Design a protein with these regions (language model features):
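Conserved donor NDP-sugar-binding/catalytic core segment of glycosyltransferases
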Residues: 171-208
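N-proximal low-complexity "stem/linker" segments adjacent to membrane-targeting elements
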Residues: 2-24, 28-40, 44-101
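Glycine-rich, basic loop-to-helix element that forms the pyrophosphate-binding segment
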Residues: 124, 138-154
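Non-catalytic, C-terminal membrane-associated alpha-helical segments of glycosyltransferases
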Residues: 303-309, 323-389
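Short aromatic/hydrophobic "clamp" motif used to bind/position activated sugar donors
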Residues: 159
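Short, acidic, metal-binding catalytic loop of nucleotide-sugar glycosyltransferases
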Residues: 100-109
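Short, flexible, basic/aromatic active-site loop/helix in glycosyltransferases
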Residues: 190, 208-231
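A short, conserved alpha-helix in the catalytic core of glycosyltransferases
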Residues: 233-250, 255-287
Length: 389
């Protein structure tokens, strides 16, 4: 049964929540004066929930600081404008929802670019023309080709990326840009939460994400964070970069990520090279997007397999092309990590991603180096020039 998703502000009286008859369970974002501070997961919730019941559930289960005595945080200050890039491939319904969420940001001086990657139909351009945004075509298949297309076409000094199946929170752009007032910061990332939990596959993917998010601001810099471990810094669904730094680094590696044999890893590779360059990556939970997780079991399995492929394609690149010994160490340690943690959680009776799904990610890892080699050979034969008009 679908889980009800709510957005609760703790500095004001809590509302009465009414779950639909087909819903069971509550997933609620908790805010303090607009800032995300925690989550409430209440699997048994049904029917009408009074403010007292919701408060009791928050008190019993949510991990929060002592908010009632905490002062209101300072508002996020206005920052330099962003070039917001959405790379998309034949997902018009998702794109429509994403672009609608970006309309207020466009009105606030931010530039929005829609990059149509290897289009097969007119569905994407039909949606894009409904909005006052720039529309670009990148004929070469691959997410990192599309990211680079937007990067080169962007007009502002800061470029932000959001997935086409995500929705931006109203404060997203300002929060993602705010850390760049520090000249040492080269990249920022933010919080990703589920847009819906309507299927079993989405619930299972949420278990996968649970231990990968935090509500604390984080700063990552080498050598404290080895570049080979840069995946801890965030996700490509919600990131921003200094444009000149990204161009200096050569842009995103087109051999990696969706639309290629490696399936993922392009964001992690960029984070690693930002750290190599000596710049800082800042993760801020104030920069929030809501992401539509994969709805079907087949999509979920394909996604997790691709995560394994992309991770080991990235680590293979670090080891073989950049001679980074940390990549080998991290690659070896990874095998015991996720599966061992899931098994331990199950033994303790805690929610955990089923081991057969973690096995999908592990299976993909075996193909990482091979897929990187295949994609390198394939792209060596590709000479199409992108259209950025």
């Amino acid at each position: 049964m679908p889980t009800h998703i709510a957005d609760l502000e703790l500095s004001t009286p809590l509302p009465t929540l009414t779950l639909q008859s087909h819903e069971r369970g509550l997933f609620a974002l908790l805010r303090w004066h607009g800032r995300p501070v925690g989550l409430l997961r209440w699997p048994q919730a049904t029917g009408t929930l009074t403010p007292a019941q919701v408060q009791a559930a928050i008190t019993a289960s949510a991990q929060l600081p002592a908010l009632p005595s905490a002062p209101a945080p300072a508002p996020i200050s206005a920052t330099a404008p962003l070039s917001i890039i959405i790379c998309t491939h034949e997902r018009p319904d998702d794109l429509q929802r994403c672009l609608t969420s970006l309309l207020p940001l466009h009105a606030a001086r931010h530039e929005v670019l829609v990059v149509d990657n290897a289009p097969r139909t007119e569905r994407t351009v039909t949606v894009a023309r409904q909005f006052p945004f720039r529309y670009l075509v990148e004929p070469r298949q691959g997410l990192d080709h599309a990211r680079n297309c937007g990067l080169h076409a962007a007009q502002h000094a800061l470029v932000a990326y959001i997935d086409d199946d995500a929705v931006a929170d109203p404060a997203w752009a300002a929060a993602l840009a705010a850390p760049f007032t520090d000249p040492a910061v080269g990249c920022t990332t933010g919080l990703v939460l589920p847009l819906e939990l309507a299927t079993a596959a989405q619930e299972r993917f949420e278990l996968y994400c649970t231990n990968r998010r935090t509500f604390q601001l984080k700063r990552y810099r080498a050598p404290q964070t080895p570049p080979a471990a840069a995946g801890v810094a965030g996700m490509g669904a919600n990131m921003a970069l200094r444009r000149d730094l990204a161009l200096t680094l050569g842009g995103f590696d087109p051999r990696l990520d969706a639309g290629t044999a490696t399936q993922s890893g392009g964001d992690t590779d960029m984070f690693a090279r930002v750290l190599d360059h000596g710049a800082t990556i800042v993760y801020t939970p104030d920069a929030l997007v809501w992401h539509r997780h994969r709805r079907s079991e087949a999509e979920l399995r394909h996604c997790l397999f691709g995560y394994g492929v992309g991770l080991y394609a990235f680590l293979s690149k670090r080891l073989l092309e950049q001679r980074d010994p940390q990549a080998l160490m991290i690659g070896v340690r990874w095998w015991g990590g996720p599966i061992a943690k899931a098994a331990w959680a199950k033994l303790r009776g805690q929610p955990a991603l089923p081991l057969e799904l973690l096995a999908q990610e592990a299976a993909g890892a075996w193909f990482g180096a091979l897929r990187l080699a295949q994609e390198t050979r394939r792209q060596a034969r590709t000479t199409v020039v992108p259209n950025t008009n």
